[in-house]
């Protein structure tokens, strides 16, 4: 097993409903460590930069509007096979298809308002972590 890092977002719908602590608890119970975290309210420019790979897709503008609608929590998670483990904890993007007991099955309101984001590959994890966190803000433990 490989020790790796992944990137996670607690999205505006979950922050608004005061689910940060519950989600963090579930992350830690899954054996992942939170090694960096902060609350931010994305600007449109930041959202455009973060989601640049989706520019031109039909959901790009609604996604940006949602992700700038309120504060989010961004965090770096570390653990054995962190990317796969966190994606399993999140569940499928569509909460109706997410397995019982996953974050999206338990907390998501819809496909768009699905409470959490997690990196899907080591490459995206590295890019997403770097977007929000300089190495000096990451505290391995």
Swiss-Prot record:
Disulfide bonds: none
SUPFAM superfamilies: Nucleoside diphosphate kinase, NDK
An example Gene Ontology biological process: CTP biosynthetic process
GO annotations of cellular component type: cytoplasm
Cellular compartment(s): Cytoplasm
Top EC class for this record: transferase
Family: Belongs to the NDK family.
Active site: 117 (pros-phosphohistidine intermediate)
Annotated Pfam families: NDK
Gene: ndk
Subunit and partners: Homotetramer.
PROSITE patterns reported in the protein's UniProt record: NDPK, NDPK_LIKE
Cofactor: Mg(2+)
UniProt keyword Oxidoreductase, yes or no: no
Record function comment: Major role in the synthesis of nucleoside triphosphates other than ATP. The ATP gamma phosphate is transferred to the NDP beta phosphate via a ping-pong mechanism, using a phosphorylated active-site intermediate.
HAMAP family (UniProt xref): NDP_kinase (MF_00451)
GO molecular function annotations of the record: ATP binding; metal ion binding; nucleoside diphosphate kinase activity
Keyword vocabulary terms for this entry: ATP-binding, Cytoplasm, Kinase, Magnesium, Metal-binding, Nucleotide metabolism, Nucleotide-binding, Phosphoprotein, Transferase
EC number(s) on file: 2.7.4.6
Catalytic reaction(s) noted: a 2'-deoxyribonucleoside 5'-diphosphate + ATP = a 2'-deoxyribonucleoside 5'-triphosphate + ADP; a ribonucleoside 5'-diphosphate + ATP = a ribonucleoside 5'-triphosphate + ADP
Family annotation (InterPro entries): NDK-like_dom (IPR034907), NDK-like_dom_sf (IPR036850), Nucleoside_diP_kinase (IPR001564), Nucleoside_diP_kinase_AS (IPR023005)
Annotated ATP binding sites: 11, 59, 87, 93, 104, 114
Protein's name according to its UniProt entry: Nucleoside diphosphate kinase
